[in-house]
From Swiss-Prot:
The modification Phosphoserine is found at S61, S82. The lineage of its organism: Eukaryota, Metazoa, Chordata, Craniata, Vertebrata. It comes from Homo sapiens. This is MAPK regulated corepressor interacting protein 2. Its main location: cytoplasm. It is found in: Cytoplasm, Stress granule; Nucleus. The gene is MCRIP2.
Length: 160
């Protein structure tokens, strides 16, 4: 039979501590020095299409990842992410692209509605099929959102 001892065992009593912050920063500094390109030399560089600077890891891979262990097995107090307060951040280039597409589409809609022709240049042409395909006579477009909702509901009901 097994017996349960009173008090902490050797495994529980031993505590593992990680490196100090100074050790982590020193090691990180050493690794970052390895990633910096070497100073230019007087020799012409050889043509190597896949040459990598000397270092402990390839340039395409990310650098070392710092891992912070829990102190005494406790999690750090963190706030749960709230979806109500979060806003997506957009880059300036993204906003410019959205603005360009929006303005271009508004111009096309104005020209299709019979707005000013503008210098008599080419106008957008809306495609209208003159002889519809008889196979598409009873075609009903599908609402993908509704279809995915039905599939999701079917999976949920089949699992329970």
């Amino acid at each position: 039979m097994y017996t349960i001892t009173k008090g902490p065992s050797k495994l529980v009593a031993q505590r593992r501590t990680g490196p100090t912050q100074q050790q982590v920063e020193g090691r990180l500094g050493e690794l970052l020095k390895c990633r910096q390109p070497a100073p230019p030399t007087s020799q012409p560089p050889r043509a190597q299409p896949f040459a990598q600077p000397p270092g402990p890891w390839p340039l395409s891979s990310p650098g070392p990842r710092l891992v912070f262990n829990r102190v005494n097995g406790r999690r750090a107090p963190s706030t749960s992410p709230s979806f109500e307060g979060t806003q997506e951040t957009y880059t300036v280039a993204h906003e410019e692209n959205v603005r360009f597409v929006s303005e271009a589409w508004q111009q096309v809609q104005q020209q299709l509605d019979g707005g000013p022709a503008g210098e008599g240049g080419p106008r957008p042409v809306q495609y209208v099929e003159r002889t519809p395909n008889p196979r598409l006579q009873n075609f009903v477009p599908i609402d993908l959102d509704e279809w995915w909702a039905q599939q999701f509901l079917a999976r949920i009901t089949s699992c329970s």
